[in-house]
């Protein structure tokens, strides 16, 4: 996995982002803007904090701690997010559920997203600034492998 480059844009969706309905227009436009600008995706920002990606939940890792936004009306309650956090807890990884800023992303050791279509995908830069050393992080890659293995075990 080579990792994604993301850009940021204001989050212009209404405040019930946990409901998967007509909320898809703005993320679709943001994803298109990212691709046209040479990025892989967009992380949306409200009041200085990351809400989520265009079709994924956002995470950073700092000093071994996984940081992701807490469940609320501000984000979609992703099924991959729920599984990933359970697997991380099973492995005694520390998780903080709270908002985080763009500056925190730039200072993070690692970042990644989760979604049903991409599983766990490392993020290696934001707005042209490398995250960590600019390569997929070891925790993100480990969590990706764990997610795939656990999903295969549970497959019918």
Give the positions of each predicted feature:
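Helix-start/capping segments and mature chain N-termini
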Residues: 1-156
């Amino acid at each position: 996995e080579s990792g994604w480059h993301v850009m940021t844009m204001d989050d212009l969706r209404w405040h019930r982002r946990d409901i998967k309905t007509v909320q898809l227009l703005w993320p679709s436009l943001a994803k298109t803007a990212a691709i046209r600008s040479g990025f892989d995706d967009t992380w949306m920002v409200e009041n200085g904090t990351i809400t989520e990606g265009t079709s994924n939940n956002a995470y950073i890792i700092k000093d071994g701690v996984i940081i992701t936004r807490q469940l609320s009306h501000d984000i979609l309650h992703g099924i991959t997010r729920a599984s990933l956090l359970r697997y991380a807890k099973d492995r005694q990884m520390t998780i903080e559920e709270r908002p985080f800023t763009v500056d925190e992303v730039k200072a993070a050791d690692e970042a990644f997203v989760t979604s049903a279509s991409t599983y766990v995908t490392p993020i290696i830069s934001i707005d042209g600034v490398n995250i960590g050393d600019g390569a997929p992080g070891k925790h993100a890659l480990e969590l990706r492998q764990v997610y795939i293995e656990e999903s295969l075990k549970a497959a019918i």
